[in-house]
Amino acid sequence: MTKLFLFLALACLVVAPMAEEIMLSRDAETGLTIVADNLRDRSNASLTLQCNIRSFFVEEVENEYGRFTKVEVPGWVSANKVGEADIPVLNKIVEVPFGGAVHAQVVSNDRAESACEEYGIYSAIYPAQESVRKDQVATFAYNEEAYKESYSRADIVTVEEIGIMRGARLVLLTVAPIQYNAADQMLTVNNNVEIELTVDDVDWTTTEINKEQYASSYFYAASESILTAESLKVTPRADANYLMIADPMFKSSAKLAEFVAWKKQLGFNVKLVYTDETGATNDTLLAYIKAQYKEFKPTFALLIGDHGQIPGWYKQFYTDLYYFTVDGTDYIPDIMYGRFSANNEAELIPQIEKTMAYEKRQFADPAYLNRFALVAGWDANWAKKRGYPQIRYAIREYFKAPEYVAAEHGVNVFLSAGSQQNVNTIFNLVNKGVGFYNYTAHGDKTMFYDPKFTNDTVDQLTNKNMYPVVLGNCCLTGSYQIDTCFGEKWLRAKDKGAVCFIGGSSYTYWDEDLWFGVGACTITSAINNGEAPAKAETGDGAYEAAVNGMYNNCNDAVIYAGNLAVQATNSSRKEYYWKVYHLFGDPSVKPAWAHK
């Protein structure tokens, strides 16, 4: 019987100074490309793809259980077989036409087997580790029995159905060209792998109808996260339909009427309904939204009311996700959504006023958009390993002079090296006005935990008409079932606070939060030492959507991009992440950036 031993987290790994690059081929770059698009061949609808590995990297590490070698392919991800040898694989979300089952097979490949020593591997390959929930202690997983086995029987290529995202059928293609014989310390590398991806009984009628009715630039047309063949690309329709569902108490709200008029002025086709028409239970609301998806085809939806008026779904914790998974039986949302969480008009009015002022660019000082607050909060084990790389990635890729003020540690960048550092400095910076405030570490229902920024802190702000987009990569800050969670506080605060808040309604995890921010990537030794991954080594993540204009650059796109990054890994928490992250605010708002 296989034994899986879990040990308490290691104090630290002794790491070699630098990973060694093992060159395999100088003729092609590492990655996956489409070489033939035959999806419109009704007798054999298929895509032919080519997977190449130019090189991989090896690095020996040591802990109290012995020496191990890490094997990494830049831009790839872990196979995530916890406790077993951590072999890198290539994952890619691929769009395919509607029809029957999807199959993947290897047509040809160059296979080379050698002793591990020939590849610079002189010890057992490091075991894959489970991602750690942010309120829990790390463990070290080592499956002793797995290291006594020869080659695993895993296929070189597999395909898994993801589901439908707004009319687009998505699958996850996994290519595992590196195979490891742990018992004999042998390695097989399959290079120049030609893959045929086929679709049974392809249904182009359904595919084209879905494209015509639902294709949206807000969702995937501009995203590099999804591999889309030319035969599936279309010009998106005008997708400005906006469904708003409110509690009946707001029928007499002049401010809500003003908000609807404003969104129409921006070009949205707004449909405002109340729960005395739609029903106010999970099931009746879902049935109504499903019907509207077919008839009205909203791109955006806004729930107007708190949990007591428009209840979330309880699935381990409260979530709004399942109101919007209306196409197919999967968990991918088909409508971009947010919530104006309000128990009364006094809580609703500030959210509307701040949204309209922001969209009208009625800024007290437009220079506030040049400022930002990027915070890797404190955790003795994880701040450096996950927080620093995420924040450093954001600085290097996006928050650069001359558009933004120079990034300076202790001024607008905070890489915590101890508990409760820079509390007052962060408050003063946010109070002065920042366009973006990102915190990653520990959170609670009413606060960023360390350095602390609480509901009471929000009350002390005076940042009128200098409202940021706030992203909290941490636990519990979006727990909207309580009276006033941290996310709700930022939106409900009058003449202060934020224009939108993105946060978790339950616990989040260290690895997944990193991927959410920077895109899917291998957790390398460099990352564990606090370095940011190279852009070429990641997919697209929340920063690409927020700052770089992906997904037509709207607030809810941040969540879509972040969760698609997690979707492209082998995390066991893909649905969990779609459930946990929530947007407090208007999902259609386009963030204002200094460089736009």
What are the roles of these predicted feature ranges?
Residues 15-19:
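Sec/Tat signal peptide C-region and signal peptidase I cleavage site
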Residues 20-596:
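Cysteine-dependent hydrolase recognition
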